[in-house]
Structure formats: structure tokens, C-alpha cells
Amino acid sequence: MKNGSISPVVLIILDGWGYREEKYGNAIAVGKTPNIDSLWQAYPRTLIQASGKAVGLPEGQMGNSEVGHLNIGAGRVVPQELVRISDAIEDGLIVQNQAIKKICQDVIERNSKLHLVGLCSSGGVHSHVNHLLGLLDVAKAKGISDVCVHAITDGRDTNPKSGLHVLKQIEYHTNQIGIGRIATVSGRYYAMDRDKRWDRIQKAYEVMTQDGYGTGCSASDLLQKSYAEGITDEFVLPVRVAPGAVEPGDGVIFFNFRPDRARQLTQAFVAPDFNGFERQTIQPLTFLTFTQYDSSFPVLVAFEPQNFNNILGQVISQHGLRQFRTAETEKYAHVTYFFNGGLEQPFEGEDRELVQSPMVSHYDEAPEMSAEDLTEVAIAAVKKQIYSLIVINYANPDMVGHTGAMDAAVNAVQTVDHCLGKLLQGISKVGGTAIIIADHGNAEYMWDEDGNPWTAHTTNLVPFILIEGEVSKIPGHGTKVPLRENGCLADIAPTILEILNLPQPAEMTGKSIIKKAEYELKPNRTPVRVGL
């Protein structure tokens, strides 16, 4: 080992790799994963919580990548936007929200339309249908009569055909309160792209902004026709159902609370220098987003970002250490923006590298995704021996798991397992420490009890494996490190700080998963286990 070189702690996040013993519909159990299997047997390991209250969500609510990475990076249980917004609606406080009051006032003064745009879903990952129903109630209370709902159907974080029930729920509510109509319907495949596939966004945008009489049938009838044609919720082609285009003078509320898949459509509406596709600027237009999608967007924000101090990346930086983050396109925001508590800018000493995801319609067409290239990027960072912390996310189990294609998901997990072996060899050569975790479950549950494809996340526990190595071999002293049970994602950052022998700040309320142990600190800040 070179003098002054660093043996890093490498946090390996297997996105969507939940734990479930039953093999039925379990791509992880069915797949051949010799590396993860041998690591699970040979090294300190435990299962940790990644859903519900353990990550700041309601009890029983499945976790997701945004929530998972927020908790991992913050080192504390982070109250999630789903809970914040639901509480504001249930308590009636949303009526007093200054941004909500402002947009309602503008619509009333201009005698214009209010448009409610968002994912109509009970999944609670990007949005919740109850928030839309709450906004409809607010509009009625404010005396706004012309309200258009631009429904984005899910089928990815929920059952592929659950949208029918949700749209009927919305139709019932609008009939009950006497205002509102579903004006357009778009599958999230189009309206919520996040990979700059602007042709998809364009289809949704144009349907929302070009007026017409619509199909002449209800939104729920339209969805039933789509099902009959073999098109499920996620892939519904954007279509106008009833009159009500977004026009100058109108107000728009985008009620998704998760930013990553709401940014591109928002850009199309509000970015002055937008060049994704040709479109006419709609002015004046009061545009409100439930949360901050991007600090540069000229919009109202109903629920401002929570500020987190002394998160993992910040602590690493404050101690003069360098760190590296890498993921492919689909998960890049998670290891950067979300991992850093919603901050776009990297900390001092934080390097990043994006690996392009394959440009395919569905990831079951390319289940390997860009895992091999990503692994090479991570190995190169390890070899430099300048980083104390390296964070890498493998997207395959989650992204392919969302397709509901079992064979492709098996291929995906096998690809990740193969790459994991290569990465661990690189880590072992520099005496590094690897921590393997997942942010939530997915690929371990591909079929429901009736054999139908399951495309959503799960509430299952996720793995935690600690691998400490010497210069020439992986085993080292890692097999003797005792781990505690009942941990959660908030405990990952304190664990990393303990390994790096850095003090845990008071704001970090998580607890190291490593039980009390004595360490001898190497000059390169990687500890070696010396005794219990």
C-alpha cells in the first residue's frame, strides 16, 4: 500500500433488494447469486427496517428510494413529506398555507381556471390521492368553480390496474362537492419521465395545454378501454377527456411531493430557457409545486424543504476527508441530492460521476442496465485511494423489478451479484471496508398471491452486510464484528462514522449497528478489529 493512501469505506446500495425467504415470485431467491450468498454466510450480517415509521413514513407504508437515501445520508429518521402534507390536510391547516392562498387568490382575481396536476395514486411514493381530494376541498372552500384535474396514472408503485379505482374515487368526490372534473389522463411513463426523454413529456404537456372537447367518455371508462387493449396504468397514452386546457392567467398546482419525476414536466411549463421541445410560453401563469423541485424554478412552493444539519456527507467534508458518489442515471439523484438532504451542490471534497442508463423503453429489455460500467467507475475510485467514503447504487433490482417481468428481474439480480464480486475484489486489494445494504424491497416480490405481476415496492426488511478486509484478502477481521438487531436505515451513517473513527454529531439520532467493540485505527482511517 502506498504511503498516505486511504482504504475507503464503500457503501454499496442494492436498490430494491429486499429480504424474503419464500422462493415464489422471488427473483433474488430464484437467481444464482453466489457472491451475495457466500457473503451472507461468512460475514457479519443482519436485517434492518426500510419502511413505515422506521423511515419517517406512516406505519405499514412501503419505503422508496428517495426516503431511503434521505434516511441513510441524514443518520436520523426523517419525517417524510407524505406525513407533513397529510397532517396539514387532515388538520385543515393547508387552507392557511401562504402559497396555497396566493394561487387561489390569483385564480379568483383573474376569473380563471385552477389546474391540479399529479400522480393519482394511493402508493404514497410520489404523491397520494388524498392530497388531491384535499385540494379539491380547498378550491371549493375558496370559491373557485372551474377546477381541472390532470390525472397521471401510476401502475408502478401500485398494482398495474389500480388506477381505475382511484379515478372512480376522484370522480365520486368531484360529484359530491360539485366542482372539478378530470380533464386529461396520462400514464406516468409519459408525464413523469426523469431521463430527458422529452418526447414523452411533450405528449403529456401538449394534451394538458391544447384544448378540445375530449373523448366523450369518463376518465374511468377510458381507463377500462385501455385495459381491454392491454395498456395498464403506467403506459396510458396522454389523452384529453374533457375541456380545460392550461391557458394564460390560469393557476397550476403540481401535487407530487417527490421532486425527481416532477421536474421535467414543471420545466416545460415554467423554465424561460426551456429547450426540451418547441412550445409556446404560457404567461401569466401562477405555478405552485407541493415541495421544492428545483431551487431555480420560478414557482410557489407550498411545503418548503426541511433543513438538515450535520448529515453524513457534511461531516465527512468538515473533517477534511474526500468522498465519491456514483450511480447510473436512474439513481444518480438519490446518491447526490437525496443523500445530501435535498442539497443540489456537492460538499467540499465530494466528487461525483454519472453513468448513463441505457435508453430503452422498459428496463426488462436491458436488465443488465449499466451495472458493468458503473462497477468500473467505482473500482477506479477505490484504486485512487484518496476517498474515505465511496457510495455506489445499483439500480437494477428496483428498476427491473418495477417492470413485473420475473425472468428479467432474475437477470438483473444476477448481474448485480456478478458486479458485486468484481467490486469487492477491488476493495479488498486496498484493505477497504464494504457495507452492503438496500434502501427498500422490490425484486424479492414479483408476483402477488394470484400470480399477477407485482410492480410496487415492499415493506420487507433489507440486508446489512459488513465486510472488513486486509490488503490481500477480503475476510480480514470482519467475521468477528458483532452486529445488533432491530436497526434501520438511519443507523447506517453512525455506523460509517464509527468505522472512520469520527464523532457522531448530536443531530444524528441513529445508532451504530456495530455493537461495542475496540478498534485500532490505521493511519489511513480504516480500523482493524483487534479483540472483543
UniProtKB/Swiss-Prot annotation:
One of its GO terms (cellular component) is cytosol. Its EC number is 5.4.2.12. The keyword Cell division does not apply. It catalyses: (2R)-2-phosphoglycerate = (2R)-3-phosphoglycerate. Monomer. Catalyzes the interconversion of 2-phosphoglycerate and 3-phosphoglycerate. This is 2,3-bisphosphoglycerate-independent phosphoglycerate mutase.
